Amino acid sequence: MFDINLIRKDIATTKEKMLNKKVPSNLFDQIFDLDVLVRSLMQQEQNLNAKKNQLSKEIGILAKNKDPKLQQTLDLVNNIKNELQDISLTLSNKQDELNKLLLVIPNMPDDSVPIGNDENDNVEIKKVFKPKKFDFLPLAHWDLAVKNKLIDFDKSTKITGSRFIIYTNFGARLYRALQQFCLDMNVKAGFSEIWAPVIVNQESLIGSGNLPKFADDLFKLENSNYYLSPTAEVQLTNLHRNEILKASDLPLYYTALTPCFRSEAGSAGRDVRGVIRQHQFHKVELVKLCKPEDSFKELESMTRQAESILEALELPYRRIVLCTGDLGFSSAKTYDLEVWLPSYNAYKEISSCSNCTNFQARRAKIRYKETIDATTELVHTLNGSSLAIDRLWAAIVENYQQEDGSINIPKVLKKYIY
């Protein structure tokens, strides 16, 4: 959730920074005015309660002494109670209104994030491995999949519909091998493996920042408070929702493999062939919880972890830093890793590593204490793909194809495929 103290302290600077993230300035004026009203109502409520409590003490004395002012004081207390009911109702409504506005405002971008409008203004940091030059015309992964019977597109459409995949034969074994390889790499790097439910509740999605703003991107289970999770970031981030952690337990590192479900609203006509954009896909996720002063260092090491998998597989990739206009809702800073796909003659996103600072922690109430007597502070949360399995599968198939259409595989995968 957006930190309202930023608006209270310096609304002008907040407006300027958030305009770079395409948030209209008048929204902050609304929040500022509502906040002033809410705090005024809270003060009125507090004053009236204090007055009521004082009069209640006096009533006992007046009754004991049979003072003629007793009835007048009783009437006054009843009037205060009625006034308190009205104020409490108004306060509750205005607090809800304020919270709803705060829930749809994205995280503030870090000062190190380049200012820009969209993906065209993202900044390339580095490239690793040059794209392979083939001595033949390389095939796209969807053509290689048909040629080698790695995917059955027709049956997946028959069973479910468009944007779903059935991997078969060697294609299925490669898919499984990539999942295990990514998990093994993450566990060896110190991440604790979690096997989590794929159905999550509304509170978890609010905590991660997916709700209420991105409801159209989610699959909701009818007549329930349950959703199919769009990413294991949701489950892993919410492991410690409504908890106060010990500072000595931080940082916490988690990794999980889950199927992910997205409606891909607004993606009609994009990446219609192959496995790049699906309603259901598998992803290995990383999540970190840490102290605020460590979060940007943790972002660098998380991104390096995802890169190490691409490097072990010897896949050409590049790292970019997202500009303010392309930054995700919950993120203060994001690195994208893009793998080279010959079929696109371009780099395509395969990992997104983000520092969400205290944005998710505020929504999910994840805090920590340095000592028992210390005040609580919000942790910082980070998340990253390590990696998106379907896109990784496509990258292996395309970059390791042979002239006869067969698929070689990286040496590090050979022990996983039998």
Swiss-Prot record:
Any one annotated GO CC term: cytoplasm
EC number: 6.1.1.11
Predominant place of localization: cytoplasm
Compartmental location: Cytoplasm
Tree of life domain: Bacteria
Residues that, per the record, bind L-serine: 231-233, 285, 385
TM segment ranges: none
Biological processes, Gene Ontology terms: selenocysteine biosynthetic process; seryl-tRNA aminoacylation
Ligand binding (ATP): 262-264, 349-352
GO molecular function: ATP binding; serine-tRNA ligase activity
Record has Cytoplasm as a keyword: yes
Keywords: Aminoacyl-tRNA synthetase, ATP-binding, Cytoplasm, Ligase, Nucleotide-binding, Protein biosynthesis
This protein's pathway: Aminoacyl-tRNA biosynthesis; selenocysteinyl-tRNA(Sec) biosynthesis; L-seryl-tRNA(Sec) from L-serine and tRNA(Sec): step 1/1
InterPro entries: aa-tRNA-synt_IIb (IPR002314), aa-tRNA-synth_II (IPR006195), aa-tRNA-synth_II/BPL/LPL (IPR045864), Ser-tRNA-ligase_type_1 (IPR002317), Ser-tRNA-synth_1_N (IPR015866), SerRS_1_N_sf (IPR042103), SerRS_core (IPR033729), tRNA-bd_arm (IPR010978)
Reaction catalysed by this enzyme: tRNA(Ser) + L-serine + ATP = L-seryl-tRNA(Ser) + AMP + diphosphate + H(+); tRNA(Sec) + L-serine + ATP = L-seryl-tRNA(Sec) + AMP + diphosphate + H(+)
NCBIfam families the UniProt entry points to: serS
Function in brief: Catalyzes the attachment of serine to tRNA(Ser). Is also able to aminoacylate tRNA(Sec) with serine, to form the misacylated tRNA L-seryl-tRNA(Sec), which will be further converted into selenocysteinyl-tRNA(Sec).
Subunit structure: Homodimer. The tRNA molecule binds across the dimer.
PANTHER family: SERINE--TRNA LIGASE, SERYL-TRNA SYNTHETASE
Family, per entry: Belongs to the class-II aminoacyl-tRNA synthetase family. Type-1 seryl-tRNA synthetase subfamily.
Domain remarks in the Swiss-Prot or TrEMBL record: Consists of two distinct domains, a catalytic core and a N-terminal extension that is involved in tRNA binding.
The name this protein goes by in its record: Serine--tRNA ligase
